Design a protein with these regions (language model features):
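Residues at the starts of beta-strands that form the adenosine-phosphate
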Residues: 2, 25, 46, 133, ...
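Rossmann-fold NAD(P)-dependent oxidoreductase module
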Residues: 14, 18, 102, 150
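Short linear motifs in low-complexity or flexible loops
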Residues: 216, 225, 233, 238-242, ...
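Active-site-lining helix/loop region of Rossmann-like oxidoreductase modules
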Residues: 6, 129-217
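NAD(P)+-binding Rossmann beta1-loop-alpha1 motif at the extreme N-terminus of oxidoreductases
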Residues: 1-39
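Rossmann-fold NAD(P)-binding glycine/threonine-rich loop
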Residues: 77-118, 122-126
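Rossmann-like NAD(P)-binding element
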Residues: 37-83
Length: 267
């Protein structure tokens, strides 16, 4: 696969390195350096990663629309800014939709925007024995297939989240997670129960495990020797872990917002 990367920052380096290891041809270009943005766009005959911050990514893509005609465009940008980690596209089109409007002849797929750049450097990103899932939003099935392959080549599992019109939900999820992780120092994973309990008390909804990318459902409740129902320990543990990570003595660590997906710092 020939992959062009627009941008030379952290996301370009992390994902580009992984794809080179997988045997793909990769060329990254920027505003300065040996390769230009136009050269990278021309090179990416199979896929082009838009590793540029918002709103610059929309302007750059629009300026290269002739070179990007018919290309698969992988958008990893997050429109998050300010001390409250506000979603700057709130109330309007998502970043992915704005890119699609700027380059209407290309096929945009939203992906790789939910994690810190260092997660994409892991080989592979596996947590608690399970590979990381990467939500994808796109309208073209051929483009989605290309990006699914690129996700798997990073060691992750692709998870279809809908068409480009749903990319705004994924971008809003990124804003929420960044707010919880960085702003509140909270364990964001604790806001969601284990899948067996996601549909209420029964836990009997028949969804193939391959679609969930999670273990098969377990009983919702257990019965102790005296016949009293008690909550599954896993659920209780998740509920207790829903607050801040650590205590008041926890050392504060500054985490740049632009480290999540492609953020607000121009590369």
């Amino acid at each position: 696969v020939r992959i062009g990367i627009l941008g030379t920052g952290g996301m370009a380096d992390a994902l580009g390195t992984q794809w080179r290891r997988a045997g793909h041809e990769v060329l990254a270009g920027g505003r300065s350096g040996p390769n230009s943005l136009a050269e990278a766009a021309e090179f990416g005959t199979d896929a082009v990663l838009l590793a540029l911050p918002y709103p610059a990514v929309v302007e750059v893509a629009g300026g290269l629309q002739d070179a990007l005609r018919g290309r698969v465009l992988v958008d990893c940008a997050n429109a998050v800014a300010g001390p409250d980690f506000a979603l700057t596209t709130s109330g309007g089109p998502s970043v992915a939709e704005r890119i699609a409007a700027a380059v209407p002849t290309a096929h945009v797929v939203k992906a790789f925007n939910l994690c810190h750049v260092d997660v994409w450097r892991l080989t592979p990103p596996v947590f608690e024995g399970r590979p990381l899932a990467v939500p994808l939003c796109g309208d073209d099935e051929g483009a989605l297939d290309v990006v699914r392959r690129l996700v798997r080549d990073v060691g992750c599992e692709p998870l279809y989240a809908g068409g480009v019109e749903r990319a705004g939900l994924v971008e809003a999820t990124a804003a929420l997670l960044i707010r919880l992780w960085v702003g509140e120092r909270a364990d964001a994973q604790a806001i969601a129960p284990p899948v067996p309990y996601a549909w209420g008390d029964s836990g009997q909804v028949a969804v193939p495990a391959r679609d969930l990318l999670l273990p098969a459902p377990q009983p919702v409740q257990q019965v102790d020797p005296v016949g009293r129902d008690r909550v599954d320990p896993q659920v209780d543990e998740a509920a207790q872990g829903a607050g801040r990570v650590g205590g008041p003595d926890r050392e504060e660590v500054a985490v740049p917002v632009d480290a999540f997906g492609e953020g607000a710092i121009d590369q």
